[in-house]
Amino acid sequence: MQKYDAIVVGAGNGGLSSACTLAKAGKRVLLIEQHNLPGGVASSFRRGRFEFETALHELAAIGKPGARGEVYELVNENYGVPITWIPVPDLFRAIHVQDDGTVLRDFTMPHGRQAFMDKMEEYAPGNREAVAKFYELFDECKAALNYIASANGSPDPKVLRKQYPNFLRVGSYSPMDVLTALKFTDDAKRIMGTYWSYMAVDMYRLSSIVYLMMVGDLVDGGAYIMEHTSHQLTTGMLEAFRRFGGESWFNVRAEEILFKDGRACGVRTTQGTVYADHIVWNGNPNMAFATMVPKGVIPERELKLANARKFSARMFVVYIGLNRTAEELGIKDYNIFISPGLDTADEYKRVGRMEKIRSTAALCYNVANPNIGPPGTCQMSFTMAYSKDVWGDVELRDYVNLKNQKAREILELYERATKTSIIPYIEEIAVATPWTFCRYAAVPEGGVYGYEAAGWDNCMARMMSLDRDFTIPGLKFTGAAGPRGDGFSESMLTGNIVGKMVLGEMAKEGK
């Protein structure tokens, strides 16, 4: 019988982080991955002479020398992964464009608190004090989350009330509530709401904590990408895991989580059965409950929670390799958010329907990393997040034509908004729909972001309930559906938190 201290199922960002934390602590850990590569969607793929980044737009919480962020401390310093981080030039450019090509607004925001504040004052005068208060709130919320993480999910309420009162106040409110309370003007709110499409939840329902952490970290510490795509990150974490003594099985599918007396005790795989007293599942709990866990051991609370939650962000992505350089095409921006500029609640409803694409996050990787592809070329991606399972209604016979139609719509939108011609120079193109992500990453409806961090299921509620939300003995969940929410940074930080929680339980068990 093969027995481990812990088994981690899934080598995505969260699973790799949990595995590294456990293995570095000296535990015997097995990492199981169904594919032949680590990373899940944190990877790359090749078409022709181009290697495309699969998912990452930019990473926060890296920071600069002397002021490193949480992700740099975790990945580079704690796990010892030698990644060279490349800074993204600006925070973002946003273009609000109508169907006829009329541009309503076009603004570019920089990194850095002071620079951001100055530029905000240029675009929306009278908001300097509001931005300053926003950052006071960000600092407090970040410190509060760090405290909760250090307490392994069991923070002292007295400490929170005394040291982080505003964190408790804003946790149940939306970003729009917070911006209104801080007295941002309407123009400033529109600028501050640009990142909503990253989360695929409108500014009236999104968790204010998630929003504060994302915007605050990106403005404060800047945004970064890896020199060699996110495949470099996940293979580096895998190497660290093995260096810590961990064992990994690839091309092996987990088929069932085993239980004894109501406690998880092992995993049945396509290569046999392995045992451990602690199982970490890097994936959506709904998938585990539906396919991997015997119904009799799932508490009623967990079933109700899973059914009450709402899947988030079903991704549609177009990847293109062009046979011209960014300079030749006149492309100067790394990251452009293109939309009609509607209220975010209206935008959210619109992306819940299968209609003409009017919004996208467009990236040109060569602007940040000129050496990412072959000489004389550049590569781009265009992402749209659907708020509902509209692709689930597509008939198989219509799928290819619809996919290609939507790809053309998103490319024409970019050309219309930026007045830049790219379609004639496309050498390679690949299109990923929610079906693609559902198949590859085994996520319901293609929702790679897990659950919407909104309303009652907000980030603060999840973090405050860490010690109560894992009710199945021996089984914990990590990744984008975890307590800190979605995204590369949050998945890795969640993985570390879950790993530490398992270590805490092992210590109590005398292991």
What spans do the regions from the language model cover?
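Helical element adjacent to the flavin cofactor pocket in flavoenzyme catalytic cores
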Residues: 212-264, 269-270
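N-terminal glycine-rich phosphate/pyrophosphate-binding loop and immediately adjacent elements
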Residues: 2-140
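A glycine-rich dinucleotide-binding beta-alpha-beta segment and adjacent secondary-structure elements
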Residues: 185, 189-199, 357-363, 420-484
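Mid-domain catalytic core of redox enzymes
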Residues: 255-374
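Active-site-proximal substrate-binding core of FAD-dependent oxidoreductases
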Residues: 259, 504-511
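A conserved FAD-binding loop/helix module that cradles the flavin
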Residues: 56, 480-502
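Rossmann-like flavin
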Residues: 100-206
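C-terminal segments that line or cap access tunnels to active or ligand-binding sites in enzymes
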Residues: 325-435
